[in-house]
Amino acid sequence: MALSTAQATPFLHCEVTYAGATQVVHATPVADPYEVAPVDIAERFLFKVVMTATRGRLDHVLIYTYLQQEPRPVLLQQAKYFAPFKPRRQPVLLTGEQHIYGGPIERELIYRCWLGGIQP
C-alpha cells in the first residue's frame, strides 16, 4: 500500500471488496456530513465515509455499511472513530480488516481503511 503523505488535509483511503472485485473509496473532511453520498458496491451494498474537522483538526471518522434492499437500505454497521488521532509519517490502518455480512444468503463485504494527513 503506497499512499502519499504530502497531503496536509486528513484523508481516509478505503479498499472495499465484494465478490472478488475491489473498489477504492477516498474521503476527506466535509462541511456538511448530510450531503455525503454513499458509494454503490455492485448494487448489493452501500458504503459511506463521513469525516469532519474543526480548524484543520480531524474531529471524527464515521463509516456506514448498508445492505441495499427494498423498500430502503438497511444499516449493517456503523463504525465511529473520534479524535485525538496520532500524527504519523505514513498512513495507518485505522479499521483493521472488516467483514460485513448481509441479506438472506449472507453476502460478504470486506473493507479496510487507512488514515493519513494527520498533522501535529
Regions found by a protein language model. Give the residues of each.
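Sec/Tat signal peptide C-region and signal peptidase I cleavage site
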Residues: 3-8
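Mitochondrial intermembrane space
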Residues: 9-120
